[in-house]
């Protein structure tokens, strides 16, 4: 067993003091599942970590970050690394650096900790970005942080919200029965959650239940007026079976044929730009032509690039929209054999 140094003894004495414990317990209430296993027996590290968190609570970001960085040389276990990455993410989020906090929370989450908060934040980011599979994964990880028994009132609110957001992901991926089951769980945990009507309304519309849709819209008018018009427009389209997220749209087959004529003329330019590694310039005209071919897209679609042993792969992303899935299926079915022999195409949800 390693002999305790004088510095360790002083740090332990400070850590065990009433004043320090008062501050530490406040942080434990917020971040316990990450703090508890981190830096076990390393009181010097815990002193630095608590000091950094005190700076966080006062929004003293520069001082807090410099204090937190002192932990970098003290990382030994996965729990230590998880805590370090997570709190770096907290600082990045408070500083408004979205790309950085997303990366840091994601790295912390890979350690499988039991704090729901970063999973919820990452899940919300992916849900807003229409990356529903990743959003689902993070919401399920958040749900797994809670035990089935002994839930506090606050736990039930958070868990109810997680199930509601999970239902939203499942709805967008057309897994309607699973979405309904998640909503039922959300209702049982959090009966009074008027904002949930924004998720319930499209499900009722897909069933053709106009009366239930009206009830949801009335709830939103009273509790979330800022979003009611958007939800109503969506449910009106669903009830009329014209929403491209859920229903196929009329296609102009002459435009589909014209797309391939255009692509044949563009091949040499495309090959040249790809050889120069000017990928964005190469793919932008393809995306713009897709919008011209399928006007219901309303905005330039996502077109990505891959490569395998046969060569380039042009990847079209349908984002789980039924109309786009149908349109791309018809488009690729009409691809001339000559173009198929020179280019590869596939369709991905995300």
Label the predicted regions.
Residues 33-42, 70-81, 108-110, 144-156:
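Flexible helix-coil transition and linker loops at the boundaries of alpha-helical arrays
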Residues 2-4, 219-249:
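Terminal, low-structured helical/coil segments at or just beyond the last alpha-helical repeat
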Residues 46, 80-83, 117, 154, ...:
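Start-of-helix register in tetratricopeptide repeats
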């Amino acid at each position: 067993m390693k002999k305790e140094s004088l510095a360790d003894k002083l740090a332990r004495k400070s850590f065990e003091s009433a004043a320090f414990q008062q501050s530490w317990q406040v942080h434990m209430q917020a971040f316990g599942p990450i703090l508890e296993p981190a830096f076990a027996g390393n009181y010097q590290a815990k002193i630095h970590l608590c000091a950094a968190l005190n700076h966080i609570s006062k929004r003293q970001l520069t001082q807090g970050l410099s204090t937190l960085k002192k932990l970098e040389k003290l990382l030994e276990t996965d729990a230590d690394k998880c805590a370090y990455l997570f709190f770096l993410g907290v600082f990045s989020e408070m500083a408004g650096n979205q790309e950085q906090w997303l990366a840091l929370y994601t790295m912390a989450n890979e350690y499988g900790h039991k704090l729901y908060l970063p999973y919820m934040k990452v899940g919300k980011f992916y849900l807003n970005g229409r990356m529903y599979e990743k959003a689902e994964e993070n919401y399920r990880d958040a749900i797994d942080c809670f035990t089935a028994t002994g839930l506090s009132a606050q736990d039930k609110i958070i868990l109810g919200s997680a199930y509601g957001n999970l239902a939203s992901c499942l709805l967008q991926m057309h897994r309607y029965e699973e979405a309904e089951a998640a909503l039922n769980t959300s209702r049982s945990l959090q009966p009074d959650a008027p904002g949930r009507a924004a998720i319930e309304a499209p499900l009722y519309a897909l069933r053709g239940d106009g009366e239930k849709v009206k009830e949801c819209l009335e709830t939103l008018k009273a509790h979330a007026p800022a979003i009611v018009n958007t939800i109503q427009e969506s449910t009106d389209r669903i009830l009329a079976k014209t929403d491209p997220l859920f229903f196929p749209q009329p296609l102009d087959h002459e435009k589909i044929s014209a797309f391939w004529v255009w692509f044949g003329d563009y091949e040499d330019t495309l090959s040249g730009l790809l050889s120069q590694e000017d990928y964005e310039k190469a793919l932008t005209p393809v995306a713009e032509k897709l919008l011209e071919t399928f006007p219901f897209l309303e905005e330039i679609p996502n077109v990505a690039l891959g490569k395998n042993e046969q060569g380039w792969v042009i990847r079209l992303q349908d984002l789980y929209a039924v109309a786009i899935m149908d349109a791309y299926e018809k488009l690729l079915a009409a691809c001339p054999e000559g173009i198929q022999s020179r280019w590869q195409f596939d369709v991905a949800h995300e």
